[in-house]
Amino acid sequence: MGASYAVNTIAEDVHARLQEITAGFGPDVIIEAVGSPVTYQMAVNEVAFTGRVICIGYAKTEVSFQTKFFVQKELDIRGSRNAQPSDFRAVIRYLERGTCPVDRLISREVTPEEAPQAMQQWSENPGKVFRILVRFN
């Protein structure tokens, strides 16, 4: 099992690309893994009628929806927070391929000594800090 397509939301017109890929219907399944209010809303707006949105990204700020889409489109929205070891291995292989824009996913790199202060800043500004990478040498 795997994704048939991946769409770069920064480099592509998401709506146009999804319409092209799906002959105008929208994707049957969208996996929201970023945790941004924008990508959560995009997932609900772009998924096909009777489609499924899988939410694994953790939004750090409130996300607002027009709930009429849930009913009108008969959506199946699911959340998941658990992963198996094989899932982590798959993510590592994906990152090793170099196709993921990692620099856009990480707000800051810190040493273990700097981590407590960085986490405090993240806690105080959840909408401004996306991910913090603690680099061990």
What are these regions (language model features)?
Residues 4-5, 76, 101:
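Conserved beta-strand segments of alpha/beta enzyme cores
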Residues 47-49:
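Helix-to-beta-strand junctions that scaffold the AdoMet/dcAdoMet cofactor pocket
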Residues 10-14, 57-61, 82-83:
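Short, acidic/turn-prone active-site loops that include or flank metal/cofactor-
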Residues 57-74, 86-93:
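Rossmann-fold NAD(P)-binding glycine/threonine-rich loop
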Residues 51-52, 75:
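Glycine-centered, small-residue-biased loops immediately flanking beta-strands
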Residues 7, 28-33, 56, 80, ...:
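Glycine- and other small-residue-rich loops at beta-strand/loop junctions that grip anionic moieties
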Residues 41-45, 85-137:
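C-terminal hydrophobic helical "lid"/dimerization subdomain
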Residues 1-42:
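Adenosine-nucleotide cofactor-binding segment
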